[in-house]
Structure formats: C-alpha cells, structure tokens
C-alpha cells in the first residue's frame, strides 16, 4: 500500500480499498448495489477486489446476481464490466436501471410498501413469470425490485417481510436506484457456457450457484426456494472443466465443500470470512441452523475464493 494514497501514483483500486477499510482493518460493506441478494458479496467486495490484477481493464461476470463486486469495479475502479445472468427477469431489471434509472425510481416511488400493494405486485409478477401476460420492461423491473427487495430472505415471488413495511426504510433503499451511476456496466442474458466461449482472452469474476451435495447448503434458492430451477441441476463439472481451460486469470467465489476443493485443487484457494446480507435485520432462525447449534441470527459465510493468477 502506498504511503500516501492520494498522490498522483495512487491507483483507483488503492484509494477505493483504503476508503473501504474500517479502523479495525476489516473491509466495510459495499452499499451501492441496489438489490438485497441471497449469497450476496457486499461484505466481500474489498477482499475480492484486492486480488484483481492491476492491469485488468475489463471484467467478465457470467453470474451477476446482486452485482456488488461488478458494480464496485465499474463505479469505483472505472473498469468496463460485462455482466451476464441466465435469469431474464433479473437481467431486465439491470437493463432498465442502466437505461432510465429516473423512470424506474419514479415508478417505485409511486408504490406504498404495504402488504396489500405487495400482494398485487406479486400476482402481477407471477403472471408474467408463468407467461400468462407480458409486462412492459419498465413495469417488470419495478415489480421485480418491489417484490424481491421487500421480501423475507429475500426471495423472488416470496412473502413480504414485516421490517420492509417501514416507509422510511423503503424510501432510503430507493436512493440507491436514484443515485445509480455506472455507465461502464452492461448486462445481458446468457449462460456461463456461452460467456466463457465468447470471451477466452478476458479476466473473469465468477460467483456461481452453490454446490448442494455434501455442503452446508440444504436447498437451492435461485430464483426461489420453492422452485430453484436455476440451482438444481447446475453444471458444476462443466464450469470446472471450462475454467481449467481458460487461459487468462480469474477469481471464483464458491461454497466450501469437497467437490469444489477437489475440482480446483490446482489453483490458489483462500478461506475468507464475512457475513451474508440475506435476511439482514431478521431475527428468526431456520430449523437447520437451530439443529446444527448456531447461536445467533447472523449468517456467516462458508465460502472459498479460488484464484488463477
């Protein structure tokens, strides 16, 4: 770290990491990503950015999800970031946000965070998801955000959390929509196989869905616990095979389990620790966590960072 981070030689990365670090030496949560997201990396951003090579000018992310790392790299480091996801409704949200954040903000501002409104929006979103209707992209983005960010968990087509009926909390959250300014981020709908084949000469950041078998994760959650169609059957072996053949550096966030450790044993494996934002503010604890003896409601990470240098 430079002695004076604010001289001409200080990189954007150095300055960002310096500002993100708390007095106790640990990184603070990165708070500019607008979505609450299961498995989100808002507290891991500093740890991950540390390992991004200094010469990188573009980052490819096949699993944008909540986008904390991707948004930080685009907003704070000024890097070009190409984000992808297989979930078209999530991709539409980002595309609308990037195209016209003010229209999205205004539409969300017109909604009251009540259970009645939530149920109406949920049914409208569900009808689109089941192909019973086709929502305009702006309305779809509005409905997705309102349903997802105000839900317990959070979860797509989930149930409204009591703590998000607080109107001031809702208005504060919308400030992230209004203030979003990340022109070097682009988001498209595509599978990880297509993305890895399309960008063989780029640096990748990947946060794939967790391995369920023999891991601490009991059930898939994408896009929602009751129908984890993107989670169940995810091709972990295919991803490992393709990454072993990828000739450029990458950083991979994965859950800690036997399969992952064996599949990526030839790469650098780190064991960082952070808290998940999923369920932040909730005090209920699930049956599985009670049975294994968790003594509070704060969910700790059980992830690995896998690095190809």
Where is each model-derived feature located?
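Short, polar loop motifs at secondary-structure junctions
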Residues: 65-66, 173-174, 254-258
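SAM-dependent nucleic-acid methyltransferase catalytic core
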Residues: 2-45, 54, 101-221, 234-235, ...
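Short loop/helix-cap segments at secondary-structure boundaries that form the rim of catalytic
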Residues: 73-76, 180, 197-199, 259-266
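Short His-Asn-centered micro-motif
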Residues: 61-63, 84-85, 188-190, 206-208, ...
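Long, positively charged, glycine-interspersed low-complexity recognition regions
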Residues: 229-309
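SAM cofactor-binding core of SAM-dependent methyltransferases
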Residues: 50, 57-126, 166-167
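Short catalytic/ligand-binding loop motif for oxyanion handling, primarily in non-cytosolic enzymes
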Residues: 68-72, 90-92, 153-156, 212-215, ...
